[in-house]
Structure formats: C-alpha cells, structure tokens
C-alpha cells in the first residue's frame, strides 16, 4: 500500500473522532490546549489499538478467504464509507440536549473514543488481506486521530457549525474510493 493511501486511511479513520471532538470543543466553556491534547491522546491510543485487533482477527481467517480477500476489503471499506456518509448527512440527534459538562471525564472520553474507533477495527480486518505493515498503519491512524481530536476540540466553537458533519462525509467518500481502488487493482492486476 502506498504512503498516500496509508495517510488517507489515517485521515479517514480520524474524521469521525474529529467530528465528535468538534462537538466536545463546542460544548466546553473555554477549551485549553492541555485538555484538548489529553482527549487527543485518549482517542489516538484507542484508535491505534482497534485496527490491530481487527488485523489479528482478519489474519486468523486469512487462509479461508484468500481467494476473495479483495472483495472483503472492498465491501468493508465501502460499507463503512457509506455508513459514514449516511451519518454525516443525517440530522443531529438528541444528544445535543444532554448536559455538556458530563462529557469530558476520562471514561466518557474513552467510551467516545472507542465508539468512534469501531470502524478502524473493521478496517483492520480488511488490512489483514493486504500487503501493509499493521504497526505503521496503526501508528498513522493513532497520530492522525491525536492531531485531529486535539485540533477539533480547540477549534470546536468556530468549526462546529461549519465543518462538523462534512468531516464525516469526506472520510466516508475517502473510504469508498480506497475500497474501489483496491478492488480495481486486484481485478486488473495493477500494483
């Protein structure tokens, strides 16, 4: 997998966490960098671990699905991408009515981080069928998430109304394109 594809996956995996961070940043009275960095580290570590778990699960099943692995990668990335696009286009839920002061403790951040990293676990399953170093991929996903969450919280008030949902749509489109590229390259013997 090319370095550009790795970076794009890292970016795509961090967009849902970025969208969540914008909401958290907008809900905080005055987010300070230390709090934003703390949230970024929590989200980044979780987001880096989940694709490794998915990759291990995928590797365990590799011998059974090697003949159609490209279809699995395409299906997983495509489905996740479409789901992210759908969530980005969907109207906001009632979670905005909740007390914002209850969303910034360690366990709340960790739970939110895990919820936004389920897609990274599924991507990890797909990565098990590709020629990619999972350690590098996990590190890139974790660093992208750390950066995006920290920035999302700091710019939450400003970006909340402008970018929030669009970030998830962009991430979904990127996943669909990468999935289609994997399928195309396998079917046409490219790469």
UniProtKB/Swiss-Prot annotation:
Subcellular location as annotated = Cell inner membrane
Its placement in the membrane is given as: Multi-pass membrane protein
Q: Where are the transmembrane segments?
A: 3-23, 37-57, 65-85, 107-129, 144-164, 169-189
Q: Which domain of life is it from?
A: Bacteria
InterPro entries the UniProt entry points to: Mntp/YtaF, Put_MntP
Record GO terms (molecular function): manganese ion transmembrane transporter activity
Pfam families given in the database record: Mntp
Keyword entries, A-Z: Cell inner membrane, Cell membrane, Ion transport, Manganese, Membrane, Transmembrane, Transmembrane helix, Transport
Q: Which GO terms describe its cellular component?
A: plasma membrane
Q: What does this protein do?
A: Probably functions as a manganese efflux pump.
Family (UniProt): Belongs to the MntP (TC 9.B.29) family.
**What's the name of the protein?**
Putative manganese efflux pump MntP
Annotated source species: Stenotrophomonas maltophilia (strain K279a)
